[in-house]
Amino acid sequence: TVALVSDAGTPAISDPGFLVVRECVRNGIEVQCLPGATAFVPALVSSGLPNDRFCFEGFLPRKKGRMTRLTSLQEETRTMIFYESPYRLVKTLTQFAEYFGAERQVSVCREISKIHEESVRGTLTEVIAHFQANEPRGEIVIVLGGKENS
């Protein structure tokens, strides 16, 4: 028996743990998953944004492919979920405003299930202003509303 454990969240979700799982499957080793903590689920539920259909994007590419990915998501109507570092949060939200429109609804959750848990909701403009005035810290989940059908 082998257990795959992550120090933050569910193994294989925005984590290279899927490589271990893939090798187990390829080698006929049975894999069972126990339900556990995944930051994006409480962030999605508490966002106030539609959660009947969503797409999980995880961490965006840092350089190569980042703008291509954002362009490919411009027409996405489902709620989108991203993980981000506190050091890149304002830059990422600013890029979201450029690609998706400054009035797009967003919820930024940090430190989920910890003593300093915080959710900031509003338009991209409002949330950018909040984090320009209040330095973000901790593990961050961004929940971005999808494009509204005209």
Spans of features found by a protein language model:
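Short beta-strands and strand-loop turn motifs
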Residues: 3-7, 53, 107-111
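General beta-strand structural signal in soluble alpha/beta enzymes
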Residues: 6, 33-36, 82, 108
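Short, small-residue-enriched loops and turns at beta-alpha junctions
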Residues: 10-13, 62-63, 116
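Short gly/pro/ser/thr-enriched loop/turn and capping motifs at secondary-structure boundaries
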Residues: 11, 38-41, 114-115
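Short, well-ordered secondary-structure micro-motifs
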Residues: 15, 43-45, 67-68, 92-94, ...
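Class I SAM-dependent methyltransferase SAM-binding "motif I" and its flanking Rossmann-like core
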Residues: 19-76
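A contiguous loop/helix-start segment that scaffolds small-molecule binding in enzyme catalytic cores
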Residues: 79, 83-150
